[in-house]
UniProtKB/Swiss-Prot annotation:
Subunit structure: Interacts with VEGFC and VEGFD. Monomer in the absence of bound VEGFC or VEGFD. Homodimer in the presence of bound VEGFC or VEGFD. Can also form a heterodimer with KDR. Interacts with PTPN14; the interaction is enhanced by stimulation with VEGFC. Interacts with CRK, GRB2, PTK2/FAK1, SHC1, PIK3R1 and PTPN11/SHP-2. Identified in a complex with SRC and ITGB1. Identified in a complex with SRC and ITGB1.
Name of the featured protein: Vascular endothelial growth factor receptor 3
Catalytic residue positions: D1037
Gene: Flt4
Naturally occurring in which organism (per UniProt): Rattus norvegicus (Rat)
Membrane topology summary: Single-pass type I membrane protein
Keywords: Angiogenesis, ATP-binding, Cell membrane, Cytoplasm, Disulfide bond, Glycoprotein, Immunoglobulin domain, Kinase, Membrane, Nucleotide-binding, Nucleus, Phosphoprotein, Receptor, Repeat, Signal, Transferase, Transmembrane, Transmembrane helix, Tyrosine-protein kinase
Length: 1363
C-alpha cells in the first residue's frame, strides 16, 4: 500500500471513530490478558502484557518516551513491543515485553487505539498498574520542585515500588501522617496534603520503614507562588507578509495576576545574528497586569522569513505563541480555483460560496462580476457569498484583481450551476377529475428541472381507498387534499393497464426559452376509474402529480335532461332531470329564476352566480329518484304534469362539490309552445280524373300539435291499403290506377285539443276500364322481351370478362401449395378447416371502411371483440367477396383460407386470426391489420427523409439483433424447414394473435429511413419466404406491393388474392386471358408457366431492386413487349440501384440467374442478409464501394466489376490465389462478395464475358403498338395478347426453356429516383401516420367515423388501398 493511501486510510478511520464517539455510539474497548487493576512482580522478573482490539493498537507506559528517545542498547533489549495474532472478534493484537524489570518500571501501562485521539478508559483504552517490588529501593521518584499555589490541596508525588507501605511526610519542621481525612496516601499517586500545611515548608520528603531499615525519598523543593498567567497574544495574530526592506514589528502581550513578574524570550530565524531588538513594557491595570515585549526589525530581508515564537514564563506557568513572517522580493498576485472551475448549488439554498485560492501582496483591489456585469455590495476577494440561491443565480462569475502601483492584473472565472428540483407545471392549474366513459383522454405532465429529468415514470392503482395524510385549514376546518400514501402503485404498461393505453410518449421541447420534458399518456378508452400519477426525478429532487381519473357516464359529472327533449306543447307532461355523479357532487336542488329580481332598480342585469342563486330564484319541490343497483349517480327530477305558458322560464339545478364545498349550477330554459286550433291553409277542390290514372289530394294544416288527420269517402273512414297511400302525417292522399268505384265525396278532418276543421271535395271518374286491356298486354310483352335481351347481353359480357372457375382459383391466389405436392384443382378439397379452432362469431365483428377492392373481392377494416381470447377490441382486416359472388369465387376464397391455415403462423407473414364460414352470412377471412400499408408506398413516401447512416436507437438495434439471433437459434434447434420458425419476437407466447393494446416503440412516419432499415426489410422478407418454402408453398407474386409494414419495423408477406383489381393495376400485364406481373416473373414462368420456389427467388431479386431504389418501378423506361421478354430470356438484366451495396448487388445477380437451379435458396439468403444486418457490414461495403467507384470509369460501374469478379473466379484460381482475393478475407461476413455454395463460383470463365448487357446499353428498336384499354403498364407501353401468342409459338418451336451458359451476359437496368433533399421531413407524416397516396393503387383511405369501428392503436389508416 502506498504511504499516502495508508495515511488517508488512517485519517478516515480516525475521523470516523471520533465521529462515532461524538455521536454517542458504543465502541468495543481493547482487552488485556491481565485482568487485575494492579499487578505485582519482583525486580528482575520479566513482564509480558498482550492487548487485543478491533482497530490498530499502540502501547504507552512510564518511561516509554525515554526509551524511544535514548535508543539505548539496554532499553532495546529489555523493552519490546511486537504484533501478535488476533482473534476473529478482535483481529488486532500488540504484546509488550519487558525483561529484567526494576523498580523504575513501576507505573501504569496503557493500551489504546492508535488512530483515536481520545483515550477513554474502558472505551478506547485499557490499562493496568504494575508494581515492580524492590525492597532496597521502595521510592522511585526523582528530585523536583513543588509549586504551592492557592488550591485547597495538592499531591506530593512520592511514588513507591512496593504497595501497602506505611508512609509519612516530613519537612524541616513537621511530620505528617495519613489520617484518612485531610492527609491521604495513594500507592499510585503519593500523599495528598492541604496547602495550608505546606506554606512554611522549605522541602518535603517521604519516609518509610521496611524491616529494620528506614528509607527516604528524593526531596521536593517547595516554592510558594500566587502569580497566575491568564492569557498571551501575539500581534498580528495571522501570518505577516512584507516586502524586502520594510519594517517588521511584533507585539507579544501577557495578561497576568496583579503584581506578577514574567520573563519573555523570543525565538526567530535571525536570532543568532541579533537582527531584532525587543523592548519590554508593563501596564498595571486595576484587576491585572499587562506585560508586553515588542520585537522590531527595521529592514527585513529574505533571511528574516520564518516562524517567530514568543515565550512567557513566571516560574509556574509557561505560555507560548507563534506567528509566521513571509518576506516577498516584489509585489505579486496569484489566484487559483479552490474547488474547481464549476460549482454547483441547489435552488432554495440559503447561501452558496464561490471560493478562490488567492495569494497577493500588497493586498490588491478587486471586483466581482456576473456575466460581465459588476456585482454590487461589499464582498470578499477570497470568496463571493450569494444568499437565497435561485435559478437566476446561475452564471459565470469573474473575480478581477489589480495592483495599479505595480501594474499587475489577474482574472479568474467560476461557473455556478444551479440545480433545480423538478417541478410538474400541471399541478399549478386545476385539472378535471371526471372523465366521460368510452372517451379518449390524454394525461399530460410537463416538468422542468436542472439537470433535465431523464424520464417520466407513470404509475396507476385501482380506485380503492388508501391512507391519506391530510392537513386541516385553521379557518375553514376542512381537510385539504393530501397525497395518498398508497403502496400498491403499479407501473403503467400496455399489458395489464386497467384502461387500454394507446400511447405513452415523452419528449423535450423548448417553452419560454427553457427545455421542458413533456410526457403524454393517451388512454384509448376510458372504462374504469383509477388513480394515475407521474413521477419525475433528477439528482437534487423529485416531484409527482396525482390524477384522480374518475370515469362517469354523465358528461362533466353534472347535467340536465328534459323529457320531451324538444320544446313541449301546452298541456304536455314535462320532466326535468338533474343528474350528478355521487363521487363529486351532493345536495342537489332545483330553483326557478325570478325574472323580476334579475335586474336592479335602474334595470341593469345583475351578475348571476351559483353562490347567490338563492337570492334570485325560488326553490322547487323535486323528487330524488331511487338509484339503480350499482349506479354511481343521483337524479333529482322536477315533474310538471301539464305544462302551461306561465311555466316557461329558466330552471336552475344546483349541486355542491364534496371536496371543495363550492356550488355549481346548470341552467335550462323551458320554452312552452302554446296550443292553437288547427287551420287549413288550402281547401280541397272537386276533381275530374280518368280511369287508370293517379289521384292525389292534399289537406295542408297549420297550427301546433296536430294529433290526428282522418280521411273519409262517402262518410266512411278511409284507411291505407293496396293502391291507397296516406303520407305526410296523413296530409296527402294518393290513389294509384283510379277505378270507377273511386268516384265520390272525400272529406279531410283535422282535430286537436283546441278543436277540429274539415274540408271536402267531389271526385268524378270518366272513361272505361276495358279500353286499357290491350295496352296492358302490349306493355307487359315489351317489358318481358327487353328483360330477356338484357339478361342475355349480361351473360355474354360476364363470360367474356370473367376467367374460368379453375382460373379464378389458381389465377387470383398468389400463394399456393407446390403443385408437385398437391395438384391445384385438388388443394381446396385436400386441405381441412377446423371450425372449433378458427370460427369467429359474426356478431363480435364490426365492419368499418373498405381498405381495398378488386374485381371479385374486397378487404375491409374491422373491429374484432375478443379475438385474442380476451375482452379487448382489436383492429383486424377482413377479406370477403363482393355481392353476387359465384360459387367458384366462394371456393377460391375458401381455398385461400385453407392455405393460410396450412401455412401456419410466422412473424413475417400476414397471419390468419379467424374466419366466418357459417351460412348465415358472407364468407369472411380475418387476418392481421398492418397500419403502415404496403412497402412500395411506404418507401416512396419516405424518400424525403432517407438518411443512410442515421443512428438507430438502442431499442431498434436490440430488435434487429433479436431478429437475426432468433432466426439462427430456431434454425439450429429445429432446422430451417420446421414450423417453429414462427418467432416469438414481439408476438407473446407463440401466438400470432397480438396482445391487446401493444405499445408501439415509435412512429415510423416520424423516424428517418436508413440503409439499415432496407437491409432489415430484405432480411425479414427472405425469412418469411424461407418459411413459406418450408411449408411447400409458392407465392407467385412476390413484390413490394404485396409486403405490408407493421409496428416495430416488422414486414409481413401477404396475398391479396381476389381483393386486388388486376384489371386496373398497371403492374399486371395481360397475357392471353390472364393478367400477369411480368416485371417480377422469372423467364421459365413467362414462357413455360412454371412456378417454383426458384421462380420466387427471381421475384425476390426484383423486390430487392424495389427496396434499394426506394419504391421505384422495375425496368424504368423499358417497353414491356416481345423484345423485352426475349432479351430477358437471353440474359439481359436490370442495372442495380445506386443505393445497393456490393453484397446486395451480388444477391440480386444470383437471384436472376438464368438457370433456376443456380439461384440461391431462401435459407442462404436469410443467412447472408442476417450477417449483414447483425454485423453492420453494409457500412464497410459502402466505403469500399465509394473507393471502387473513384477508381473506375463511369462506363464500368462498381456493380459490373464486382459482379464479374465474383462470377468468374475458378476453383483453381480460388485455391491458388492468396486469401485476400477471397472476398477481402471477409467471406464469412459476405461483405464484398456473396458466398453461395455451388452457386457463384463454378466452371471456367467464358471467353469474352468481361461485361454484362444492360437494357440501356443495347438500343431499343422503336416499335409502335396499338394499346388496348385493358393493356396498361406503368411505363405507358403495353404488350398485346397477339404478341404473347407469337412469343409462345416461337418458344414452342425453339423447345422448352433452358438456362443460359454460366458465362452468359446478364444485364442490370439502372433506375433510381432523385434522392436530393431526403432530410426534409414529409408533411404527410406529421399527423401521426396519416398517409395520402396517389391514384396508382387506389383512392385515399378515409378514417373510420366515431362509432363505426373500435379505436385502434394510433387511430391510423391501414395505409394500403389494395389490402
Amino acid at each position: 500500500m502506498q504511504p499516502g493511501a495508508a495515511l488517508n486510510r488512517r485519517l478516515w478511520l480516525c475521523l470516523g471513530l471520533l465521529q462515532g464517539l461524538a455521536n454517542g455510539y458504543s465502541m468495543t474497548p481493547p482487552t488485556l490478558n491481565i485482568t487485575e487493576d494492579s499487578y505485582v512482580i519482583d525486580t528482575g522478573d520479566s513482564l509480558s502484557i498482550s492487548c487485543r482490539g478491533q482497530h490498530p493498537l499502540e502501547w504507552t507506559w512510564r518511561g516509554a518516551q525515554e526509551v524511544l528517545t535514548t535508543g539505548g542498547k539496554d532499553s532495546e533489549d529489555t523493552q519490546v513491543v511486537q504484533d501478535c495474532e488476533g482473534t476473529e472478534a478482535r483481529p488486532y493484537c500488540k504484546v509488550l515485553s519487558l525483561a529484567q524489570t526494576h523498580a523504575n518500571n513501576t507505573g501504569s501501562y496503557y493500551c489504546y487505539y492508535k488512530y483515536i485521539k481520545a483515550r477513554i478508559e474502558g472505551t478506547t483504552a485499557a490499562s493496568t498498574y504494575v508494581f515492580v517490588r524492590d525492597f532496597e529501593q521502595p521510592f522511585i521518584n526523582k528530585p523536583d520542585t513543588l509549586l504551592v499555589n492557592r488550591k485547597d490541596s495538592m499531591w506530593v508525588p512520592c511514588l513507591v515500588s512496593i504497595p501497602g507501605l506505611n508512609i509519612t511526610l516530613r519537612s524541616q519542621s513537621s511530620v505528617l501522617h495519613p489520617d484518612g481525612q485531610e492527609v491521604l496516601w495513594d500507592d499510585r499517586r503519593g500523599m495528598r496534603v492541604p496547602t495550608l500545611l505546606l506554606r512554611d515548608a522549605l522541602y518535603l520528603q517521604c519516609e518509610t520503614t521496611w524491616g529494620d531499615q528506614d528509607f527516604l525519598s528524593n526531596p521536593f523543593l517547595v516554592h510558594i507562588t500566587g502569580n497566575e498567567l491568564y492569557d498571551i497574544q501575539l500581534y498580528p495574530k495571522k501570518s505577516l507578509e512584507l516586502l524586502v526592506g520594510e519594517k517588521l514589528v511584533l507585539n507579544c502581550t501577557v495578561w497576568a495576576e496583579f503584581d506578577s513578574g514574567v520573563t519573555f524570550d523570543w525565538d526567530y530565524p535571525g536570532k543568532q545574528a541579533e537582527r531584532a531588538k525587543w523592548v519590554p513594557e508593563r501596564r498595571s491595570q486595576q484587576t491585572h497586569t499587562e506585560l508586553s515585549s515588542i520585537l522590531t526589525i527595521h529592514n527585513v530581508s529574505q533571511h528574516d522569513l520564518g516562524p517567530y515564537v514568543c515565550e512567557a514564563n513566571n516560574g509556574i506557568q509557561q505560555f507560548r505563541e507563534s506567528t509566521e513572517v513571509i518576506v516577498h522580493e516584489k509585489p505579486f498576485i496569484s489566484v487559483e480555483w479552490l474547488k474547481g472551475p464549476v460549482l454547483e448549488a441547489t435552488a432554495g439554498d440559503e447561501m452558496v460560496k464561490l471560493p478562490v485560492k488567492l495569494a497577493a501582496y500588497p493586498p490588491p483591489e478587486f471586483q466581482w462580476y456576473k456575466d460581465r456585469k459588476a456585482v454590487t455590495g461589499r464582498h470578499n476577494p477570497h470568496a463571493l457569498v450569494l444568499k437565497e440561491v435561485t435559478e437566476a443565480s446561475a452564471g459565470v462569475y469573474t473575480l478581477a484583481l489589480w495592483n495599479s502601483a505595480a501594474g499587475l492584473r489577474q482574472n479568474i472565472s467560476l461557473e455556478l450551476v444551479v440545480n433545480v428540483p423538478p417541478h410538474i407545471h400541471e399541478k399549478e392549474a386545476s385539472s378535471p377529475s371526471i372523465y366521460s366513459r368510452h372517451s379518449r383522454q390524454t394525461l399530460t405532465c410537463t416538468t422542468y428541472g436542472v439537470p433535465q429529468p431523464l424520464s417520466v415514470q407513470w404509475h396507476w392503482r385501482p380506485w380503492t381507498p388508501c391512507k391519506t395524510f391530510a392537513q386541516r385549514s385553521l379557518r375553514r376546518r376542512q381537510p385539504r387534499d393530501g397525497m395518498p400514501q398508497c403502496r400498491d402503485w403499479k407501473e403503467v404498461t400496455t399489458q395489464d393497464a386497467v384502461n387500454p393505453i394507446e400511447s405513452l410518449d415523452t419528449w423535450t421541447e423548448s417553452v419560454e426559452g427553457k427545455n421542458k420534458t413533456v410526457s403524454k399518456l393517451v388512454i384509448q378508452d376510458a372504462n374504469v376509474s383509477a388513480m394515475y400519477k407521474c413521477v419525475v426525478f433528477n439528482k437534487v429532487g423529485q416531484d409527482e402529480r396525482l390524477i384522480y381519473f374518475y370515469v362517469t357516464t354523465i358528461p362533466d359529472g353534472f347535467s340536465i335532461e328534459s323529457e320531451p327533449s324538444e320544446d313541449p306543447l301546452e298541456g304536455q307532461s314535462v320532466r326535468l332531470s338533474c343528474r350528478a355523479d355521487n363521487y363529486t357532487y351532493e345536495h342537489l336542488r332545483w330553483y326557478r329564476l325570478n325574472l323580476s329580481t334579475l335586474h336592479d332598480a335602474q334595470g341593469n342585469p345583475l351578475l348571476l352566480d351559483c353562490k347567490n342563486v338563492h337570492l334570485f330564484a325560488t326553490p322547487l319541490e323535486a323528487n330524488l329518484e331511487e338509484a339503480e343497483p350499482g349506479a354511481r349517480h343521483a337524479t333529482l327530477s322536477l315533474n310538471i304534469p301539464r305544462v302551461a305558458p306561465e311555466d316557461e322560464g329558466d330552471y336552475v339545478c344546483e349541486v355542491q362539490d364534496r371536496r371543495s364545498q363550492d356550488k355549481h349550477c346548470h341552467k335550462k330554459y323551458l320554452s312552452v309552445q302554446a296550443l292553437e286550433a288547427p287551420r287549413l291553409t288550402q281547401n280541397l277542390t272537386d276533381l275530374l280524373v280518368n280511369v287508370r290514372t293517379s289521384l292525389e289530394m292534399r289537406c295542408p294544416v297549420a297550427g301546433a300539435h296536430v294529433p290526428s288527420i282522418v280521411w273519409y269517402k262517402d262518410e266512411r273512414l278511409l284507411e291505407k291499403e293496396s293502391g291507397i297511400d296516406l303520407a305526410d302525417s296523413n296530409q296527402r292522399l294518393s290513389i294509384q290506377r283510379v277505378r270507377e268505384e273511386d268516384a265520390g265525396r272525400y272529406l279531410c278532418s283535422v282535430c286537436n285539443a283546441k278543436g277540429c276543421v274539415n274540408s271536402s271535395a267531389s271526385v268524378a271518374v270518366e272513361g272505361s276500364e276495358d279500353k286499357g286491356s290491350m295496352e296492358i298486354v302490349i306493355l307487359i310483352g315489351t317489358g318481358v322481351i327487353a328483360v330477356f335481351f338484357w339478361v342475355l347481353l349480361l351473360l355474354i359480357f360476364c363470360n367474356m370478362k370473367r376467367p374460368a372457375h379453375a382460373d379464378i382459383k389458381t389465377g387470383y391466389l398468389s400463394i399456393i401449395m407446390d403443385p408437385g405436392e398437391v395438384p391445384l384443382e385438388e388443394q381446396c378439397e385436400y386441405l381441412s378447416y377446423d371450425v372449433s379452432q378458427w370460427e369467429f362469431p359474426r356478431e363480435r365483428l364490426h365492419l368499418g371502411r373498405v381498405l381495398g377492392h378488386g374485381a371479385f373481392g374486397k378487404v375491409v377494416e374491422a373491429s374484432a371483440f375478443g379475438i385474442n381470447k380476451g375482452s379487448s377490441c382489436d383492429t383486424v382486416a377482413v377479406k370477403m367477396l363482393k355481392e353476387g359472388a359465384t360459387a367458384s369465387e366462394h371456393r377460391a376464397l375458401m381455398s385461400e383460407l385453407k392455405i393460410l391455415i396450412h401455412i401456419g403462423n410466422h412473424l413475417n407473414v400476414v397471419n390468419l386470426l379467424g374466419a366466418c364460414t357459417k351460412p348465415n352470412g358472407p364468407l369472411m377471412v380475418i387476418v392481421e391489420f398492418c397500419k403502415y400499408g404496403n412497402l412500395s408506398n411506404f418507401l416512396r413516401v419516405k424518400r424525403e427523409t432517407f438518411d443512410p447512416y442515421a443512428e438507430k436507437s438502442p431499442e431498434q438495434r436490440r430488435r434487429f439483433r433479436a431478429m437475426v439471433e432468433g432466426a439462427k437459434a430456431d434454425r439450429r434447434r429445429l432446422g430451417s424447414t420446421d414450423r417453429a420458425l414462427f418467432t416469438r419476437f414481439l408476438m407473446g407466447k407463440g401466438s400470432a394473435r397480438r396482445a391487446p393494446f401493444v405499445q408501439e416503440a415509435e412512429d415510423l412516419w416520424l423516424s428517418p429511413l436508413t440503409m439499415e432499415d432496407l437491409v432489415c426489410y430484405s432480411f425479414q422478407v427472405a425469412r418469411g419466404m424461407e418459411f413459406l418454402a418450408s411449408r411447400k408453398c409458392i407465392h407467385r407474386d412476390l413484390a413490394a406491393r404485396n409486403i405490408l409494414l407493421s409496428e416495430s419495423d416488422i414486414v409481413k408477406i401477404c396475398d391479396f388474392g381476389l381483393a386486388r383489381d388486376i384489371y386496373k393495376d398497371p403492374d399486371y400485364v395481360r397475357k392471353g386471358s390472364a393478367r400477369l406481373p411480368l416485371k417480377w416473373m422469372a423467364p421459365e414462368s413467362i414462357f413455360d408457366k412454371v412456378y417454383t420456389t426458384q421462380s420466387d427467388v427471381w421475384s425476390f431479386g426484383v423486390l430487392l431492386w424495389e427496396i434499394f431504389s426506394l419504391g421505384a418501378s422495375p425496368y424504368p423506361g423499358v417497353q414491356i413487349n416481345e423484345e423485352f421478354c426475349q432479351r430477358l430470356k437471353d440474359g439481359t438484366r436490370m442495372r442495380a440501384p445506386e443505393l445497393a451495396t456490393p453484397a446486395i448487388r451480388h444477391i440480386m445477380q444470383s437471384c436472376w440467374s438464368g438457370d433456376p437451379k443456380a439461384r440461391p435458396a431462401f435459407s442462404d439468403l436469410v443467412e447472408i442478409l442476417g450477417d449483414l444486418l447483425q454485423g453492420g457490414g453494409w457500412q464497410e461495403e459502402e466505403e469500399e464501394c465509394m473507393a471502387l467507384h473513384s477508381s473506375q470509369s463511369s462506363e464500368e460501374d462498381g456493380f459490373m466489376q464486382a459482379s464479374t469478379t465474383a462470377l468468374h473466379i475458378t476453383e483453381a484460381d480460388a485455391e491458388s490465389s492468396p486469401p485476400s482475393m477471397h472476398c477481402h478475407s471477409l467471406a464469412a461476413r459476405y461483405y464484398n462478395c456473396v458466398s453461395f455454395p455451388g452457386r457463384l463460383v463454378r466452371g471456367t470463365k467464358a471467353p469474352g464475358s468481361s461485361r454484362m448487357k444492360t437494357f440501356e446499353e443495347l438500343p431499343m428498336t422503336p416499335t409502335t403498338y396499338k394499346a388496348s384499354v385493358d393493356n396498361q403498364t406503368d411505363s405507358g407501353m403495353v404488350l398485346a395478347s397477339e404478341e404473347f401468342e407469337q412469343i409462345e409459338s416461337r418458344h414452342r418451336q425453339e423447345g422448352s426453356f433452358s438456362r443460359k451458359d454460366p458465362g452468359q451476359h446478364m444485364d442490370i437496368s439502372r433506375g433510381h429516383p432523385d434522392l436530393q433533399g431526403r432530410r426534409r421531413r414529409p408533411t404527410q407524416g406529421a399527423q401521426g401516420g396519416k398517409v395520402f397516396y396517389n391514384n396508382e393503387y387506389g383512392e385515399v383511405s378515409q378514417p373510420c367515423t366515431e362509432g363505426d369501428c373500435c379505436p385502434s392503436a394510433g387511430s391510423t389508416f391501414f395505409a394500403d388501398s389494395n389490402y
